[in-house]
């Protein structure tokens, strides 16, 4: 049996880039909670003792940006300089302007257009992916790397591993078998965890705790064997972390946010963007399409692409590739997809309820992945029934 290795990585909520994603989405939540028609393009950057929120926001909401910055940093665990940032004493800078009137008239006609008339907020192409290798219909490499990161945060916050600090990264390599285009995981080849820690803990203690409290609860035993390689804090020291260790910026972790390198990516980031930004809403609807194709038994694995022009409601193109795993020809699956899903941005926002903010709705997406999550707020994960002729397939 010929196999190959594939790797995906993830980062914790305390990684500086992810901190920025979460602040940008916390701002989006606050705007949409008060004004569902808010137009938000919110970027965040961070470095030692400083967080800056900047971008273009048109909203009727009364938003305290500085409070959002401090609350988000505090919630992650950045409560003192020695962990990488002090939420209550860092500099919080704000530079927000209104959305360009040129963009506003072309996209939503200064809020005068009906939902079906609303144009894409920009040009671009987005991809959705699904695979039958996990119950979530997501790649195993991505699922495991993401869960390891989430588990690191869990054992830090519940006190199981008190030496942990907020920043951290994970990476998982899986050995796969290609079954006529479908991906079949055979075993976990390598597990890599680099986590921020305090001064008190030894490298041996770090390795033992990570194996017992993080890896063991996350990675199914059937995938681990005596040949599995573990790199646990291989640099030997990771005390300085968060924005103190590295600068952070919104939109720097787009592969972690999606499919861990599987499928494809159009390059657009998600966080801090309202649903007229097709970087986000377009990617969400094609995930729903790809997931529905696999869940309905039309294929074992597939990628769906959609593309847009600024100001134009209808997509320029829709593409489906099932990697040879389709039960019927891809062109027939494409026809079903076009009949089932409405790719116009205004309709995506309605059908996926993307104008509803608050209650950390989008903040939740900004760490540990936008896809494959079991949460009713992740409306794009709902499988739609697809009508096709199984008898003659």
From Swiss-Prot:
What pathway annotation does it carry?
Amino-acid biosynthesis; S-adenosyl-L-methionine biosynthesis; S-adenosyl-L-methionine from L-methionine: step 1/1
Q: Which cofactor does it need?
A: Mn(2+); Mg(2+); Co(2+); K(+)
Molecular-function GO terms, alphabetical: ATP binding; metal ion binding; methionine adenosyltransferase activity
In UniProt terms, what function does this protein have? Answer: Catalyzes the formation of S-adenosylmethionine from methionine and ATP. The reaction comprises two steps that are both catalyzed by the same enzyme: formation of S-adenosylmethionine (AdoMet) and triphosphate, and subsequent hydrolysis of the triphosphate.
Q: What is this protein called?
A: S-adenosylmethionine synthase
Q: How many cofactor units bind, and how?
A: Binds 2 divalent ions per subunit. The metal ions interact primarily with the substrate. Can utilize magnesium, manganese or cobalt (in vitro).
**Principal location:** cytoplasm
- A GO CC term attached to the entry: cytosol
């Amino acid at each position: 049996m010929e196999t190959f290795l594939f790797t995906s990585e993830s980062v914790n909520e305390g990684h500086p880039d992810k901190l920025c994603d979460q602040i940008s989405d916390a701002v989006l939540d606050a705007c949409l909670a008060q004004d569902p028609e808010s137009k938000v393009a919110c970027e965040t950057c961070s470095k030692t003792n400083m967080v800056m929120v900047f971008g273009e926001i048109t909203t009727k909401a009364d938003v305290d940006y500085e409070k959002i910055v401090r609350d988000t940093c505090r919630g992650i665990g950045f409560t003192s300089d020695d962990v990488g940032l002090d939420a209550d004493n860092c500099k919080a800078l704000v530079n927000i302007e209104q959305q360009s009137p040129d963009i506003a008239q072309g996209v939503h006609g200064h809020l005068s257009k009906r939902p079906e008339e609303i144009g894409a907020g920009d040009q671009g192409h987005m991809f959705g992916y699904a695979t039958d290798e996990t119950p979530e219909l997501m790649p195993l490499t991505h699922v495991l790397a993401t869960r390891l990161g989430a588990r690191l945060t869990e054992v830090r916050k519940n006190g199981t591993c008190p030496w942990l600090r907020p920043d951290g990264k994970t990476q998982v390599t899986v050995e796969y078998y290609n079954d006529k285009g479908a991906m079949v995981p055979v075993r976990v080849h390598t597990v890599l965890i680099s986590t921020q820690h305090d001064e008190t803990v030894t490298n041996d203690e770090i390795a033992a705790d990570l194996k017992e409290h993080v890896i063991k609860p996350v990675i199914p035993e059937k995938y681990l064997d005596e040949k599995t390689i573990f790199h646990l804090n291989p640099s030997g020291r990771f005390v300085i972390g968060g924005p103190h260790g590295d600068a952070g910026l919104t939109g720097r972790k787009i592969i972690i946010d999606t499919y861990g390198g599987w499928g494809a990516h159009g390059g657009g980031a998600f966080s801090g963007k309202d649903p007229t930004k097709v970087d986000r809403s377009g990617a969400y609807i094609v995930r729903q399409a790809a997931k529905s194709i696999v869940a309905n038994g039309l294929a074992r694995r597939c990628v769906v692409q959609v593309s847009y022009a600024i100001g134009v409601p209808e997509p320029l193109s829709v593409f489906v590739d099932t990697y040879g795993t389709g039960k019927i020809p891809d062109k027939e699956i494409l026809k079903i997809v076009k009949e089932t899903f409405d790719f116009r941005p205004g309709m995506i926002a309605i059908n996926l309820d993307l104008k509803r903010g608050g209650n950390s709705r989008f903040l939740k997406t900004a760490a540990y992945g936008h896809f494959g999550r079991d949460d009713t707020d992740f409306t794009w994960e709902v499988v739609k029934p697809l009508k096709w002729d199984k008898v003659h397939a």
